[in-house]
């Protein structure tokens, strides 16, 4: 990134209403407890509509039936999405059995949704079941605290089951960072777990009384895999190992993908390298980055409030120097690292500890019993007999981890009988979508429900041009907020309106380049026509090992985005 002429450290002006809401919330309590007892509405009112996000929930409604209910003079069918806090995506089989039961008995849709932030979501929780879901999670050692809104969200960690010691060390740091940056308010325990109010005054030494200016995302990355897409995140710790043992981290700050259609003050941005730090400084540095963003982030405009905008406003070197000052360290030069891929290796792999790990492809992360493919039941049966754990990946897949040789055949039999090991193409394995319709209130176009048939068409194009054994990193996101991480794909579709998308090209396979808009507001048939031509050219003209995104740049089909704060919209 180029060093912009430094602007003010703090943006003066009228604060957003979200800042008022946080300040008046009494450390995130609001009147949520009273609202829970209001049976006249299925939703939360006023500030509570937003405050519940700090408790891991979003209020949604079924948009497929919204108009019909309005005609009947009924309020929307309100239901909550709940997102679990699950650092590194590791979940025990006992915990899995509990969430399977809750999803089946207490949600409208009956499904478990794995997300690309290495956790699971329940969709369709009615208000009467909101308190029970938090209590169920607590009973098995889980919670939903700080998985949404202006806090440090679920901390990601590379799903690396092969190098077991390195993964274990990195995973422990992901958990430590998550715990260190959690809010200290007792509001969650008081409201959901019926814990008594104590006489002490709440304090938030790291997050502050009004918490962060905007959402904040953190990762721990183990090269050469970039499965967690570090450039989508505010703060990234890239593991540096010597002889298979973790010795420290490279720190990268200021990634983020959310944009707003037509608003050139918004942009996706890759993270900036700050330097290397030994392990013992990890928590101090994490706290310093968060508190610098807390104090310098823009609280007058939520569309310009994320860390990426703070870095561009004050300058990377200024922000870095402040982190060094607060953490009491000087960063060492970045240690060498490289990424070679970010997809999951589907199927069995043997770890260096001689245990086996089975990565299951879960299309769109949606776990449900389908006709002839009882995925949810199959995973429950595996959870009942498996002695290791499950690991949710940042590609919305699931790893059955730590399987001894003696148990391998038994688990494989259940997986195959349940449709969990059905063969899929490389293209389908490397495609992803966010949830979008019918539950997401921000959705502009279909994503999860659109992707399977769209990939059928892409598979046909790949076969037509003789590249069925290849893949293109392809992602669909239903709106420009970018949950599907389309703005780090080789081919990214960003929802614009029902049935219409902006087509972005020119990202790369390893997720280190932002794609540029190639065509705007086009239909599926127009997208397929464009890709038919371009895949054909790639098949004929590519260099050895050249990915589709790199080809589109080299062939002059699309100009690479070099400095997105300045040239993304050119």
Swiss-Prot record:
Which positions bind [4Fe-4S] cluster? Answer: 434, 440, 479, 483
Cofactor annotation comment:
Binds 1 siroheme per subunit. Binds 1 [4Fe-4S] cluster per subunit.
The superkingdom of the source organism is Bacteria
Q: Is Repressor set as a keyword in this record?
A: no
Q: Write the Enzyme Commission number(s) for this entry.
A: 1.8.1.2
Annotated catalysed reactions? hydrogen sulfide + 3 NADP(+) + 3 H2O = sulfite + 3 NADPH + 4 H(+)
Q: Which InterPro entries match?
A: CysI, NiRdtase/SiRdtase_haem-b_fer, Nit/Sulf_reduc_fer-like_dom_sf, NO2/SO3_Rdtase_4Fe4S_dom, NO2/SO3_Rdtase_4Fe4S_prot, NO2/SO3_Rdtase_4Fe4S_sf, NO2/SO3_Rdtase_FeS/sirohaem_BS
Keyword annotations for this protein, in alphabetical order, are: 4Fe-4S, Amino-acid biosynthesis, Cysteine biosynthesis, Heme, Iron, Iron-sulfur, Metal-binding, NADP, Oxidoreductase
Q: Which Gene3D superfamilies match?
A: Sulfite Reductase Hemoprotein, domain 1
- Biochemical pathway: Sulfur metabolism; hydrogen sulfide biosynthesis; hydrogen sulfide from sulfite (NADPH route): step 1/1
**Record's GO cellular component terms:** sulfite reductase complex (NADPH)
The reply on keyword Coiled coil is no
Q: Where does the chain bind siroheme?
A: 483
One GO biological process term is: cysteine biosynthetic process
Which Gene Ontology molecular function entries are recorded, alphabetically? 4 iron, 4 sulfur cluster binding; heme binding; metal ion binding; NADP binding; sulfite reductase (ferredoxin) activity; sulfite reductase (NADPH) activity
The family annotation for this protein states: Belongs to the nitrite and sulfite reductase 4Fe-4S domain family.
Q: How does it assemble?
A: Alpha(8)-beta(8). The alpha component is a flavoprotein, the beta component is a hemoprotein.
Task of the protein: Component of the sulfite reductase complex that catalyzes the 6-electron reduction of sulfite to sulfide. This is one of several activities required for the biosynthesis of L-cysteine from sulfate.
Record's protein name: Sulfite reductase [NADPH] hemoprotein beta-component
Protein's organism: Escherichia coli O127:H6 (strain E2348/69 / EPEC)
